[in-house]
Amino acid sequence: MNRSDLLENPRTQTESGFLLIHKPVGMTSSDLVVTVRKKLGFKKVGHTGTLDRAASGLMILPIGSCTSFSSVFLEKEKSYEAWVRPGESTDSGDKEGEILESLSKEQTETWFQEHQEKLRDLFEQVPTWETQEAPEVSALKVNGRRRSDLFREGVALVPAVRKIKIYRYELGEFSPESISFQIRVSAGTYIRKIVMDISDRIGFPLRLEKLVRTSIGKLNLNQADSYESLLDGKIKIHPPETILDFPTVEVPDTEVRNVLNGRKIKLEWIPVNEFLLVSPEEEILAWCKKEEHGIHELDYKYLRVFPKN
């Protein structure tokens, strides 16, 4: 069976690869991993970054030896479609949190009529933002514990400020009922915190109503299988060469065994930074990284070797 075919009898599968799944609202990233293990029978399943329970969208789940590549996706750019509800705010910035303020429809419409130009200006300034303070309700760890757990216990948290970059931004609907935008951001950017910060700056309650992650790096949501397909046990395994961005260097048959045993071999060329060594059959043998300032044919190191089963 081709590795990119649908799984017909998943519990017999021993191969590695990636699953692209559309996570539904109401499920944590960890919940999705558990479901994959139960439904498909894979013992080794990872994920490449969390997606809030209240959000839906693309999740990349590596299986088998490809779990070694989980960290690769943590630093990828990500795209989202967001819908904001004017007139209500929560401590988490989305509908999962505790309500801090809630205005009536009439109050919201009255405020909007008087201040919509200033509010629009704040939303249009988002592409200029360069730093962001992580929300108190988040999965970030402080001494091994989630910030959200500490916040709920009343522990005072030190602000966790990080640099962010907005690569693309488009403001859509703008009304007292709903504000929407599309955005592409650097890794670690919280979309709900953008909404919370705008709310704080203007003194008007706002929160995320809906958030959909539409891409991670070069991978898009339209490539993902539905959650229903996962429950039916029919889901696509994507081979690593179609998912990973690394350049490849082919290893001759005579050197394959040396690579699998972790011995360096002479390479005709070494790509910049990280790369993959592959067999003539295009099987991934090793994940490598060029040594800093390396110019010699052996100036690289193995990050991970993938022995054959």
UniProtKB/Swiss-Prot annotation:
Gene Ontology molecular-function annotations: RNA binding; tRNA pseudouridine(55) synthase activity
Positions of transmembrane segments: none
Q: What class of enzyme is it?
A: isomerase
Assigned keywords, A-Z: Isomerase, tRNA processing
Q: Which InterPro entries match?
A: PsdUridine_synth_cat_dom_sf, PsdUridine_synth_N, tRNA_psdUridine_synth_TruB
Q: What is its EC number?
A: 5.4.99.25
As its record notes, the protein acts as a catalyst of:
uridine(55) in tRNA = pseudouridine(55) in tRNA
Can you list the disulfide-bonded cysteine pairs?
none
Q: Name one GO biological process term.
A: tRNA pseudouridine synthesis
Q: Name one Pfam family in it.
A: TruB_N
Catalytic residue list = 52
HAMAP family xref list? TruB_bact
Q: What does this protein do?
A: Responsible for synthesis of pseudouridine from uracil-55 in the psi GC loop of transfer RNAs.
Homology family = Belongs to the pseudouridine synthase TruB family. Type 1 subfamily.
NCBIfam families membership: TruB
Q: Tell me the protein's name.
A: tRNA pseudouridine synthase B
The lineage, from the top, is: Bacteria, Pseudomonadati, Spirochaetota, Spirochaetia, Leptospirales
